[in-house]
Amino acid sequence: MTISAPPIIDIRQAGLESSIPDQVVEGLTKEVKTLPALLFYSTKGIQHWNRHSHAADFYPRHEELCILKAEASKMAASIAQDSLVIDMGSASMDKVILLLEALEEQKKSITYCALDLSYSELASNFQAIPVDRFHYVRFAALHGTFDDGLHWLQNAPDIRNRPRCILLFGLTIGNFSRDNAASFLRNIAQSALSTSPTQSSIIVSLDSCKLPTKILRAYTADGVVPFALASLSYANSLFHPKGDRKIFNEEDWYFHSEWNHALGRHEASLITQSKDIQLGAPLETVIVRRDEKIRFGCSYKYDKAERDQLFHSAGLEDAAVWTAPDCDVAFYQLRLRLN
């Protein structure tokens, strides 16, 4: 018997693609120019990112896999029966499948919901899951943003009283500034954990590595350049769907990677190849100077003091930690701080 892939539920509250151009204009007309993260996660962008994250030098994924292979059963044991497990940005399924298999082995009746911006990536990922092997774990897919996912958790009546386990794998929290990371976790805690605080949790991966050579090897590994440049093609298609004009000529740009010691973060930017660049309509008044950085991504690293501050500011406490020898990455189970 063939078991069909789970349905993909559209939980988007607003037109995502209609909002990205506004964010592009806002970011490129500031003194310190930026591009929004959403611009980098088109279907092509996600495919390039998956290739990059599978590169030999990209240690975060390899370390997460190492930990999950060793500790998935303990993670699964910490998740309450009848939980709704929400994967906030599912991307590649090869990591989370280890946790799902452990939940199945423990006969945990849970519903796994993968949240992603890309409909086609959700469909592709679920086609690769052997759902017929699972009898206790049920599957669903959610098409939307982080905010859409939190809104759905708060407002869908049939799931309101179930325990929740929010998965933030892939060093997702590191993509936010430290203040914004605390705000994001606090928002998740208030939206998703408060209905069943003693049984609900967040499982988040964080990276403590601050060794520049290791970090720069990882973040310049194979696949990152096409990932970065795919954003420019996507921007052109959003502003000029007919393809008759361009804001960016992709050949004018290259990817720039650096470690910011003072802020404890890796920074990813686009820089012009060799000259000042005038952007195309509707940003023809914007000149990007030679060697001026357009930053699009940061990956913050967390030592113990920074982790403690993050969790405290978010109103959370760590209930469990899972890591492995020689790994800088670790998974933290966070619960609402009740006192």
From Swiss-Prot:
One Pfam family per UniProt: Methyltransf_33
Assigned keywords, A-Z: Alkaloid metabolism, Methyltransferase, S-adenosyl-L-methionine, Transferase
Single GO MF annotation: methyltransferase activity
Keyword field contains Transferase: yes
Record EC number: 2.1.1.261
Record flagged with keyword Methyltransferase: yes
GO biological process, one term: ergot alkaloid biosynthetic process
Record's catalysed reaction(s): 4-(3-methylbut-2-enyl)-L-tryptophan + S-adenosyl-L-methionine = 4-(3-methylbut-2-enyl)-L-abrine + S-adenosyl-L-homocysteine + H(+)
Family annotation (InterPro entries): EgtD_Methyltrsf_superfamily (IPR051128), MeTrfase_dom (IPR019257), MeTrfase_EgtD-like (IPR017804), SAM-dependent_MTases_sf (IPR029063), SAM_MeTrfase_EasF-type_put (IPR017805)
Pathway: Alkaloid biosynthesis; ergot alkaloid biosynthesis
Record-stated family: Belongs to the methyltransferase superfamily.
Summary of subunit composition and partner proteins: Homodimer.
Stated role: Methyltransferase that mediates the second step of biosynthesis of ergot alkaloid biosynthesis. Catalyzes the N-methylation of 4-dimethylallyl-L-tryptophan in the presence of S-adenosyl-L-methionine, resulting in the formation of 4-dimethylallyl-L-abrine. Ergot alkaloids, which are produced by endophyte fungi, can enhance plant host fitness, but also cause livestock toxicosis to host plants.
Name assigned to this protein: 4-dimethylallyltryptophan N-methyltransferase
Organism: Aspergillus fumigatus (Neosartorya fumigata)
